[in-house]
Amino acid sequence: HYVDICDDWEPTIEMMGLDQDAQLNDVLAIIGMGASPGISNLLARLVCEELETVEDLFTVWPVDAGERGDAIEKAVQENKGTSGAIIHWMQQISGEIDLIENGKQVSRPPMQAIELQYPGLGSGSGYTVGHPEPLTLAKSMGISGNSANLMLMQSATAAFITNLGKRINQGKTSIEDAALQVGSPSPMGKLKAALSQSRYPKANDLPPFFAWGKGTINNEQFVVAARITSSPPAMDSATAWPLAIALQQLLESRAEGVGVHAPEKIIDLGHFFDAFAKCSEPPMSGADEIVEIVREKL
């Protein structure tokens, strides 16, 4: 069997195409079982279980906004400038990415601001980035509207990253050079971002990591959101623990079946969040404490 933490939407499409081969060979493959994708997919499934029909569905993670929005900063520090993760990020904020519009997979430029109204916390904006979640969730959750993966950023960061993406698209800088500029931005790059940041909406009080859906309950429109209230302290552990728990489910036959599956289709949610709660910081007692689901009638 097979489990990975792939966060690239293009290989995800290719791997989903191997579903029949996996079934014929009695192989169970769980793809994208990290933090995002991974936990994000499971939160999205919890959102969809609250709704009778699903119109829009978004998964959201922090770049440099929110309590634990330091993933990119830590990656830069630990790799003295750049890394495979930063190079991959530059690929996903330039060119075009696939996401879901009106229930269909389409290609669009990244770094588009999407405003979400979070029940009880108000509205804030995230920015589209190339990721697997919308492509697998559209099929597994029956989305009729829009779906994308969003990043939470400070306005100046959004301006800087958007400008980097434009320079990549115009052939003025390479993916690799852009990745280096993330860790060591030029004075001109910082100045341009500072001058244009007012045009980029903020995350405001949105939580750092959540799934958000809009749909119907009893023929009435609702917004539902699910977030984790604690997590492991660093990007590597927040990615590794979900993979380890998925492997445990494979070994204990909690995740059963054959074929290629995204996390939302195959993972035992109760067991997963009970286990994840115990390896978070601060540790939580179980699924009921580490997951918070809220909803609001529109």
Regions found by a protein language model. Name each.
Residues 8-13, 36-39, 62-68:
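Short gly/pro/ser/thr-enriched loop/turn and capping motifs at secondary-structure boundaries
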Residues 5-28:
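Rossmann-fold NAD(P)-binding glycine/threonine-rich loop
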Residues 49-298:
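C-terminal catalytic/substrate-binding lobe primarily of soluble NAD(P)-dependent oxidoreductases
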Residues 31-43, 48, 242, 246:
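Short alpha-helices
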Residues 19-24, 46-52:
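Short, surface-exposed basic-aromatic patches at helix termini and helix-loop junctions that form
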Residues 16-19, 44-45, 72-75:
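Short, glycine/charged-enriched secondary-structure capping and boundary segments
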